[in-house]
From Swiss-Prot:
GO terms for molecular function: rRNA (cytosine-N4-)-methyltransferase activity. The gene is rsmH. It catalyses: cytidine(1402) in 16S rRNA + S-adenosyl-L-methionine = N(4)-methylcytidine(1402) in 16S rRNA + S-adenosyl-L-homocysteine + H(+). It comes from Exiguobacterium sibiricum (strain DSM 17290 / CCUG 55495 / CIP 109462 / JCM 13490 / 255-15). Belongs to the methyltransferase superfamily. RsmH family. This is Ribosomal RNA small subunit methyltransferase H.
Length: 312
């Protein structure tokens, strides 16, 4: 069963400012929690929802069956956002949502290899047809590449120690499972550091997952496509779960909402220099106390919202 607790659901739905006749895109369908709330508010409008996961798509088709005709499910990575929509004759939309968290079932179903709490073959592929899995990263990538992803994507200060431990272990035998990797990570991190900051494998698993799915590069490309696809007055909502994604989102929004350097004393800003976006939220929205109590995964969630002010 594909059960997934939607994070910042009402804040993001409100942020989209949904019109009953609007065209909307959920780039991260997952458990369809956001998608269901969007289609509920549509009459003549339409929702396009993306996911790479066959299980998620099948579950969503069932969950949204009562709204037949108001939605289209697309099996694709959102890096192909513009291409997939244009193939369906959609060139402008009224709202786009990204929820960049890994779906709870992907974390909780042990066989997917996303979680350090379940023993499974190293996998972590969101798209099960992708050739690169966590197994290849852990067993085949050079030491320097392991250090780079652990430090950059996981912000792991013991990246060198962990990479060295992995390198030595795989010389003896391949590292096959999540628990084998967890034990190596625990051995690599000094005992005092293991006792604080959550599970010792958390940062390493995040880093490998990001590398396997090329998450940061994919999001960086997709967010600019999303900005371009918005009609004037359209909203873009992005929910991030770690500082790398949030920084990337913040930078893209800042770039598109800032004025260029202009001579001082201009009586008015020439129209061609007006920014493309308006920041609806200057600071990110975070989960309230009730949601924090109900869903621990909401602790790191940040929602940023922008509105399209003019065509680029």
């Amino acid at each position: 069963m594909f059960e997934h607790e939607t994070v910042l659901k009402w804040e993001s739905i409100k942020g989209l400012n949904i019109k009953p006749d609007g065209i909307y895109v959920d780039c991260t369908l997952g458990g369809a929690g956001h998608s269901e709330e969007i289609v509920k508010q549509l009459t003549t409008g339409h929702l396009y929802a993306f996911d790479q996961d066959d299980v998620a798509l099948a579950h969503a088709a069932e969950r949204l069956a009562a709204y037949e005709g108001r939605f289209t499910l697309i099996k694709s990575n959102f890096v192909h956002l513009k291409e997939e929509l244009e193939a369906r004759s959609v060139t402008k939309v009224d709202g786009i949502l990204f929820d960049l968290g890994v779906s709870s079932p992907q974390l909780d179903e042990g066989e997917r290899g996303f979680s350090y709490n379940f023993d499974a073959r190293l996998d972590m592929r969101m798209d099960q047809t992708s050739p690169l899995s966590a197994y290849e990263v852990v067993n085949e990538w050079p030491y320097n590449d392991l250090v780079r992803i652990l430090f950059t994507y996981g912000e792991e200060k013991f990246s060198k120690q962990i990479a060295r431990k992995i390198e030595k272990a795989r010389e003896i035998a391949p590292i096959e499972t999540t628990f084998e990797l967890v034990e190596l990570i625990k051995d690599a991190i000094p005992a005092p550091a293991r006792r604080k900051g959550g599970h010792p494998a958390k940062r390493t698993f995040q880093a490998i997952r990001i590398a396997v799915n090329d998450e940061l590069n994919v999001f960086d490309r997709a967010v600019y496509q999303a900005i371009d696809l918005l009609a004037v007055g359209g909203r873009l909502c992005v929910i991030t779960f770690h500082s790398l994604e949030d920084r990337m989102c913040k930078q893209a929004f800042k770039e598109k909402s800032s004025l260029p350097e202009l001579p001082q004393g201009l009586p008015m800003i020439p129209k061609e220099f007006e920014p493309e976006l308006r920041l609806v939220t200057r600071k990110p929205i975070t989960a309230g106390d009730d949601e924090l109590d109900d869903n621990r995964r909401s602790r790191s969630a940040k929602l940023r919202i922008v509105e399209k002010m003019k065509e680029s």
